Curated annotation (Swiss-Prot):
One of its GO terms (molecular function) is cysteine desulfurase activity. It catalyses: (sulfur carrier)-H + L-cysteine = (sulfur carrier)-SH + L-alanine. Belongs to the class-V pyridoxal-phosphate-dependent aminotransferase family. NifS/IscS subfamily. [2Fe-2S] cluster binds at C325. Keywords: Iron, Iron-sulfur, Metal-binding, Pyridoxal phosphate, Transferase. It comes from the Bacteria. It comes from Bacillus subtilis (strain 168). InterPro entries: Aminotrans_V_dom (IPR000192), Aminotrans_V_PyrdxlP_BS (IPR020578), Cysteine_dSase (IPR016454), PyrdxlP-dep_Trfase (IPR015424), PyrdxlP-dep_Trfase_major (IPR015421), PyrdxlP-dep_Trfase_small (IPR015422). This is Putative cysteine desulfurase IscS 1. Its cofactor is pyridoxal 5'-phosphate. The active site is at C325. The modification N6-(pyridoxal phosphate)lysine is found at K202.
């Protein structure tokens, strides 16, 4: 039985070309990048090269890239680091109700520490507006954090509009771009973004890698203490193989962005058309106009999502009910709850399909046929 992986928004397989670049550095470039001898200088060269390439990709300066262990750490450093560094200027933070839990739980922690958090509502497409942000801004607002593209329903937020609004305000603008990076072109200067989080394993790079872009004008308090790595902002010996892999994954995603976007959009159409041809009733969750190309969230009226997922897994098709970080949770999706309310049937009858490396049109059609068969059997 062929297994079909359509859960790339949870994690993506590593591109073999990325692995090829990493392998020599597991044993070859083993020197500590902070050491002044030749072994250390060799490792430092690879780290600096990666930093320069990644910075250029988003229109940043090299010193504005902080390597992290992934998106969660990058989000924590952006939010906690800002809160600790700017608490004397204010204790108000604005975010949305559909953020990744790396953002939401960090904000909840700060609430317990005396910070005031405003959680913006979203419309039924999962979108906020710059107007909402403007209305929520206060003199003591020190940070606005709005994700670039949602990991569950794929809705893309009006980042440039929000950035334009905030450029004259003292509040820093952070965006969790983990799901969007590599598929949407991002220029931090043109979008007036102060802080941006990225994870390697969502773009066919290695797990345990990522970075935080922090504008040179941003002041952050470090969360890790020890050495003076990353310009004293993130202590710990650099993961040279991982950083090399992250650099290569970002390079490939940039070179192949247009091709992937076109392919994934066609996959969405194939999936939906196959369901329609089979006579299956469904609706799309999320904004159809402002959407990530690889994420498709579907609502099947009257179908138990648990039964659907189990049956699909038995058929060799891997999809999900939402964020992998809430797998096994008895609570419904906080994203769908924010969009449709606590009583909506969509909370218990929706699945997320997400496309990526290795998927073919034939696989997508086969998976959609399996979904149609299971839905018919369950209704």
């Amino acid at each position: 039985m062929e297994r079909i992986y359509l859960d790339h928004a949870a994690t993506s397989p590593m591109d073999e070309r990325v692995l090829e670049q990493m392998i020599p550095h597991f044993s070859g470039s083993f020197g500590n990048p902070s050491s002044i001898h030749s072994f250390g200088r060799e490792s430092r060269k690879w780290v600096d090269e990666a930093r320069a390439q990644i910075a250029a990709e988003i229109g940043a300066a090299e010193q504005e890239i902080i390597f992290t262990s992934g998106g969660t750490e990058a989000d924590n450093l952006a939010i906690m680091g800002t809160a600790l560094a700017r608490k004397d200027l204010g204790r108000h933070i604005i975010t949305t109700k559909i953020e990744h839990h790396a953002v939401l739980h960090t904000c909840e922690k700060l609430e317990g520490d005396g910070f005031d958090i405003t959680y913006l509502d979203v419309d039924q497409n999962g979108r906020v507006s710059a107007k909402q942000v403007k209305e929520a801004l206060r003199d003591d607002t020190i940070l606005v954090t709005v994700m670039y593209g949602n990991n569950e329903v794929g809705t893309v937020q009006p980042i440039e509009e929000i950035g334009e609004l905030l450029k004259e305000h003292k509040a820093y603008f952070h965006t969790d771009a983990v799901q969007a990076f590599g598929l949407l072109p991002i220029d931090v200067k043109n979008s007036h973004i102060d802080l941006l989080s990225v994870s390697g394993h969502k773009l066919n790079g290695p797990k345990g890698t990522g970075f935080l872009y922090a504008s040179k004008d941003v002041k952050l308090s470090p969360l890790l203490f020890g050495g003076e790595q990353e310009r004293k902002r993130r202590a710990g010996t650099e993961n040279v193989p991982g950083i090399v892999g992250l650099k290569e994954a970002i390079k490939l995603s940039s070179e192949e962005r247009d091709e992937k976007n076109e392919k994934y959009q066609s996959f969405k159409a194939i999936f939906a058309d196959t369901l329609r041809d089979a006579g299956v009733a469904f609706e799309v969750n999320g904004d159809k106009e402002h959407s990530l190309p690889h994420v498709l969230n579907l609502y099947f009226p009257g179908v138990s999502v648990e039964a659907l997922l189990v049956n699909l897994d038995m058929a060799g098709v891997a999809v999900s009910s939402g964020s992998a970080c809430t797998a096994g949770s008895v609570l419904p999706s906080h994203v769908l709850t924010a969009m449709f309310g606590e009583e909506s049937d969509r909370l218990t009858s929706s699945i997320r399909i997400s496309f990526g490396l290795g998927n073919t049109a034939e696989q997508v059609k086969t998976a959609a046929k399996h979904v149609a068969d299971v839905v018919k059997r369950l209704t």
